[in-house]
């Protein structure tokens, strides 16, 4: 089993803690709620042994990554921007992205918005629902007020 390396990188205006292992094509593992990189501790060495450079960040507001105070700093655009910046900080141009639970929408949106970077996407433990009559943002406003 390979030893995990921990470090902090600057991305999208925040300091992001990452755990990483291995060499090869980049695979990014986005944790769920309320978790951290540690959720991927068993997958990191296995993927590294399989020939990948695997990275599990603490996402914005979790673990040892910065937690901006403003609620508006936690949009999908910010979260995906953090991951795009992570790819850049690692001097890579493409990556596979996998999300678990709350990390799945980050993975989906990263692949949707930046297909030039994210060439494959995986989502675990999250339901996919049929498109509703109302946009999800409108439903959230109704359920959570302003």
Language-model features: locations:
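Flexible "cap/lid" subdomain of the alpha/beta-hydrolase fold that forms the substrate-access gate
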Residues: 2-4, 15-16, 55, 62-98, ...
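A generic fold-level signal
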Residues: 11-13, 21-22, 116
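Short polybasic/polar patches that bind polyanions
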Residues: 10, 48, 88
């Amino acid at each position: 089993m390979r030893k995990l390396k921990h470090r902090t990188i600057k991305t999208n205006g925040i300091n992001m803690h990452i755990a990483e292992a291995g060499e090869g094509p980049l695979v990014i593992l986005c944790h769920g709620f309320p978790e951290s990189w540690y959720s991927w501790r068993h997958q990191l060495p296995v993927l590294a042994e399989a020939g990948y450079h695997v990275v599990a960040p603490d996402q914005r507001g979790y673990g040892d990554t910065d937690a901006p105070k403003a609620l508006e700093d936690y949009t999908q655009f910010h979260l995906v921007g953090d991951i795009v910046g992570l790819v850049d900080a690692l001097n890579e141009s493409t990556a596979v992205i996998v999300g678990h639970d709350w990390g799945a929408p980050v993975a989906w949106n990263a692949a949707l918005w930046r297909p030039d970077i994210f060439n494959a996407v995986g989502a675990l433990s999250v339901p996919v629902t049929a498109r509703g009559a109302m946009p999800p943002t409108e439903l959230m406003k109704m359920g959570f007020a302003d």
